[in-house]
Curated annotation (Swiss-Prot):
Belongs to the methyltransferase superfamily. Tam family. It catalyses: trans-aconitate + S-adenosyl-L-methionine = (E)-3-(methoxycarbonyl)pent-2-enedioate + S-adenosyl-L-homocysteine. Keywords: Cytoplasm, Methyltransferase, S-adenosyl-L-methionine, Transferase. One of its GO terms (molecular function) is trans-aconitate 2-methyltransferase activity. SUPFAM superfamilies: S-adenosyl-L-methionine-dependent methyltransferases. GO terms for cellular component: cytoplasm. It is found in: Cytoplasm. The keyword S-adenosyl-L-methionine applies. The keyword Lyase does not apply. Its EC number is 2.1.1.144. This is Trans-aconitate 2-methyltransferase. Pfam families: Methyltransf_25.
Amino acid sequence: MHDWDPALYQRFESERTRPAVELLARVSHPAPRHIVDLGCGNGNSTQLLLERFPQSQLIGLDNSEAMLASARKRLPGVPFVQADIADWAPTVAPDLIFANASLQWVAGHAGLFARLMRCLAPGGVLAVQMPDNLDQPSHQLMRELASQSAWRDQLAHAADQRAALLSVEAYYDLLAPMACRVDIWHTAYRHVMPSVQAIVEWLESTGLKPFLDPLSAVLRDAYLQAYTQRIGEAYTKRADGHRLFAFPRLFIVAQRAP
């Protein structure tokens, strides 16, 4: 994929930050010394971590240089490092690994989650939030359009960028043998959006990227036009003219056994 667009991502920063706030609220570690914000993006989650744990040694990691540049501008005193989660390993065992809306882009969750738990210091916490929306109309429509003849060749592998999440039970069974506490829950947000275009703009910065990046400008415009029409049909106007954009997310907080 092309690099991420921080400006586009930040248009809905309040809505994107809310899950990070709610994830962090369930982290009970009293004083983590070493914290890693894994997939820190533009630093919105890193800022929350810094505010709650100002005495910790905090580092942000992401594979997008554009997002890291935005994060460094936001928090010039925090070290941000370009790295790939798939092969990342800490030099010091973290007391908290915080991964807000990042691990859904990494394949092989059975091995990944076990590896991250092993990276933690004894008593350390793995806190994860992941969109669980591949079965929502927003993402079903991406795949349906990609299968049509106009875009099929260019988008044959677009849906492969994100694998479906494991079941809640599977994540629990992965983590429980290594943990003294596992807290796992779903939240289905209903974002109040002013227009169809607002929903599409939200998705352009994240879920739509694998479907838009491979296309030429002409094909991209045609895909977006068709997608916007379908989104308008799937997310109809409510009584006040707004549209409710459903966005389920999975939250996991697992504390490694001391």
